Amino acid sequence: MEYIRLNNGIEMPALGYGVFKVDPKECERCVSDALCTGYRLIDTAQFYANEEAVGNAIRKSGIDRKDIFLVTKIWLTNSGDRKSQESFEESLRKLQTDYVDLLLVHQPFGDYYGTYRTMEKALAEGKTRAIGVSNFYADRFHDLACHVDVVPAIDQLETNVFSQQTRMRKLLSETGTKVMAWGPMAQGKDNFFGHETLVAIGRKYGKTASQVGLRFLVQQGIPAIPKTTNIERMKENFDIFDFTLDNQDMEALLSLNMHDSGTRDYTDLSYASRIIAQTF
């Protein structure tokens, strides 16, 4: 495993397992499989409605809590000082732990300033080791970073070979904030798994397109959280630490950046309205 140092000095694994849209009934088994495979970063969220299953899997694994990097996120319907604090305490209860390693604001809507104050308090109290945001683009990230006491350690964004977030990464570098990649395999879009460049580079190293895409991110210091419910896929995704992409291959992959800031427009009112209306 390789590690990435955050702007507060703590280290996180460069590769993790994400549980977005993993059925709570199946999630415990999936997280158990991931931990058995070797994953030590687990990414969940209140909105995923599977924190309890994640907590069960971690408790039953027998792995020391300090050896697992646990991430969760506060949903926008729980935004604001009071509701975010209450919901975070509930998340800790479900996860069966007295702290998480990284706590994020899930969406750039609602009273996320109140939520962030709750997170700063949780950081001071040792209930999280780092704090950050998710899906915050340039304007909202910059405004937030200018008006908080603790700048975000992470901004979790849709990031992959086709959406490389070069503009956001430049902005985030000013505060030492790291991009964390959700959708690191583009959710299979744009022929990711069969893309001729990914496949050709993979053939050179004896790797799959998925492994090349993940290695591309990790090699740039971008932690990634691929999701699968298949243990063989988990093993495949995890097997990216025995090769290094050369400069020529990195240049070829950099040229695949088709929609730099991702496939979702958070400034589009219809899309924003759909996000704001979502509950769990």
Q: What are the residue ranges of the model-derived segments?
A:
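N-terminal binding-site loop/beta-alpha segment at the start of enzyme catalytic domains
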Residues: 1-68, 185-186, 280
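Beta/alpha (TIM)-barrel catalytic core signal, keyed to glycine-rich beta->alpha loops juxtaposed to Asp/Glu
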Residues: 3, 107-280
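Acidic (Asp/Glu)-rich catalytic clusters
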Residues: 7, 55-65, 89-96, 121-123, ...
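Acidic-and-aromatic substrate-binding clefts and catalytic sites of carbohydrate-active enzymes
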Residues: 22-25, 45-53, 77-82, 108-113, ...
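Short, acidic/polar
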Residues: 23-34, 80-94, 141
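A structural motif
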Residues: 39, 97-100, 128, 152
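Glycine/small-residue-rich loop that forms an oxyanion/phosphate-binding "nest" at active or ligand-binding sites
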Residues: 77-116
